[in-house]
């Protein structure tokens, strides 16, 4: 009898765990979609203010329902497939881009809970999948994103779309090298590939290590502009040259999926910047009353500040030429990133500040032992 009882309890446990996981996934997806909608609203409002305009102000109070009106407009538009295009690839491309933009959020920790285990405080991040190779997972997902763009440009049977796709692929591949090396400097200082552990380690570090990694934060931020095809590096979508780039032939929901994927990636890469360089869910200053505010609020506020910088740059800085973009990535950021990897390694070794033995941090994986 006990055998069947154990099978039943295991089955109920699996069902409950699956239900909790499904709820987490749906909560993250809905949050990202709503964030994308109001990021577009924020972008239009900020650019309007910089250009001395009002921005959206008709649909709903203060124009707050404008994103939903835009969504309805895209849904009811006619879906047109270009003549002589590869229809299957043409339809799959936006699905790939949108899906990969959401998959990256699986390892992003939004906050953390603190529990006591054998007299030690252990921090458990609030994340869908707390995997040991979270950083590698993020890099792999971001690298795969270029396939959706390449497929879209090739399958559209349009020279404008194909040139935009080639530009986007070369641009993303070029700046992923710099982004990867900047992340390596953080890994050298923290000693973990788990994003939650990186946040905890950065919080417990001395301030001089934060100053040492500050130039890499600048390189990461500028490279993220190029990685997400944002101004002033939006060469794949140069309206004056390529009309709209790789998505020029798309309309209705396929276009909306590209649009959602682009802005979801924009939020994701700023979430990565907050985790690697700006303290994650911890307050910006180590003051006791600031810890009353939940960590997820600090996490979101930091992302909003970086997104505002993205929008500000779009409204004020002119577009780079393509040769300037490539030169910046390969002749400036790549040498600086390589130099900083060596410099950080040497400084950590010389000052005996290598991770684990330097900070004495109780990490999440201790619960697994």
From Swiss-Prot:
GO terms for cellular component: plasma membrane. Pfam families: NADHdh. It is found in: Cell inner membrane. One of its GO terms (biological process) is aerobic respiration. Keywords: Cell inner membrane, Cell membrane, Membrane, NAD, Quinone, Translocase, Transmembrane, Transmembrane helix, Ubiquinone. It is a multi-pass membrane protein. PROSITE patterns: COMPLEX1_ND1_1, COMPLEX1_ND1_2. The chain crosses the membrane at residues 20-40, 88-108, 133-153, 179-199, 205-225, 267-287, 293-313, 328-348. Its EC number is 7.1.1.-. GO terms for molecular function: NADH dehydrogenase activity; oxidoreductase activity, acting on NAD(P)H, quinone or similar compound as acceptor; quinone binding. It catalyses: a quinone + NADH + 5 H(+)(in) = a quinol + NAD(+) + 4 H(+)(out). Belongs to the complex I subunit 1 family. NCBIfam families: PRK06076.1-2 (NF004741), PRK06076.1-6 (NF004745). NDH-1 shuttles electrons from NADH, via FMN and iron-sulfur (Fe-S) centers, to quinones in the respiratory chain. The immediate electron acceptor for the enzyme in this species is believed to be ubiquinone. Couples the redox reaction to proton translocation (for every two electrons transferred, four hydrogen ions are translocated across the cytoplasmic membrane), and thus conserves the redox energy in a proton gradient. This subunit may bind ubiquinone. NDH-1 is composed of 14 different subunits. Subunits NuoA, H, J, K, L, M, N constitute the membrane sector of the complex. This is NADH-quinone oxidoreductase subunit H. It comes from Ehrlichia canis (strain Jake).
């Amino acid at each position: 009898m006990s055998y069947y009882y154990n099978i039943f309890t295991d089955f109920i446990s699996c069902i409950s765990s699956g239900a909790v996981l499904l709820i987490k996934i749906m909560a993250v997806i809905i949050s990202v979609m709503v964030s994308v909608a109001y990021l577009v609203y924020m972008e239009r409002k900020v650019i309007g203010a910089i250009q001395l305009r009002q921005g959206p102000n008709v649909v709903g109070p203060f124009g707050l329902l404008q994103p939903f009106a835009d969504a309805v407009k895209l849904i009811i538009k006619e879906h047109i497939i270009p003549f002589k295009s590869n229809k299957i690839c043409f339809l799959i491309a936006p699905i790939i881009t949108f899906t990969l933009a959401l998959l990256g959020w699986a390892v992003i920790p939004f906050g953390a809970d603190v529990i006591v285990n054998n007299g030690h405080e252990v921090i458990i991040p609030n994340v869908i999948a707390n995997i040991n190779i979270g950083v590698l997972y993020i890099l792999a997902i971001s690298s795969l994103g270029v396939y959706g763009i390449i497929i879209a440009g090739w399958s559209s049977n349009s020279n404008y779309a194909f040139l935009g796709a080639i530009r986007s692929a070369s641009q993303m591949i070029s700046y992923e090298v710099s982004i990867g090396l900047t992340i390596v400097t953080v890994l050298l200082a923290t000693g973990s590939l788990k994003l939650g552990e990186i946040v905890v380690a950065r919080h417990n570090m001395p301030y001089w290590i934060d100053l040492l990694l500050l130039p890499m934060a600048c390189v990461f931020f500028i490279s993220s502009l190029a990685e997400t095809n944002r101004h002033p590096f939006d060469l794949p979508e140069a309206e004056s040259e390529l009309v709209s780039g790789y998505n020029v032939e798309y309309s209705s929901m396929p276009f909306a999926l590209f649009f959602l994927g682009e802005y979801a990636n924009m939020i994701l890469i700023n979430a990565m910047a907050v985790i690697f360089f700006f303290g994650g869910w911890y307050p910006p200053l180590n003051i006791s009353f600031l810890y009353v505010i939940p960590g997820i609020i600090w996490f979101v506020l930091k992302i909003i500040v970086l997104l505002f910088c993205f929008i500000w740059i779009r409204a004020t800085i002119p577009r780079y030429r393509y040769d300037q973009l490539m030169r910046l990535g390969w002749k400036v950021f790549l040498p600086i990133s390589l130099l900083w990897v060596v410099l950080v390694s040497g400084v950590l070794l010389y000052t005996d500040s290598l991770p684990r033995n330097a900070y004495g941090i109780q990490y999440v994986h201790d619960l697994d032992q």
